[in-house]
């Protein structure tokens, strides 16, 4: 991130822009207005985490399965997955899911529910996969009866939008210190904080809403870029090609022609 700002900067900037007194301290301030600004900043930061998959918050989760264990605890800072990033790196296949409750019960109780691909869902704060890893259904096992774990990988957005300025690799989802580094775009966050404060006071938010939306639209697309789109896409072929064959594990023959 190009602009590094802390909690005190965001609150101070918002208050000064609204014509309020400049605070000497923020998180530990006894002033009721400053306390409300910090509380609204926590709300605004949480909203912005959900509102857009910020590149600063994207993390990769590598999961190595265990014999007989179908469900695994999610990362402690998990907020939500990036869609279609779930992959079985052992077999080089994308995972199938997330499955609905109805599909999951069909997988567990149906007559024709098994297959080589791994299915998944998120339930009760855990990442659950089907089939359950075991020596029987692990297709990569070199020796019959030997368990070989699957290595699964996926990307998610962390809920922690603040970084401790004094402690390495320490992140928070709520303000704890004036010096906590804001990982979100500070100008969007400042505009949103002003809007939240005006809204909380029951005042007319028309101007601040316009300012926030304009700042959001102007800066959000610069966060990580975007691909170029064509107005004349090519239709995919119905014949055998790169779009409809597996990524690997297909028989290439023994080199002998018949």
What kind of region is each of these model predictions?
Residues 1-258:
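Glycine-enriched, solvent-exposed interface loops adjoining structured elements
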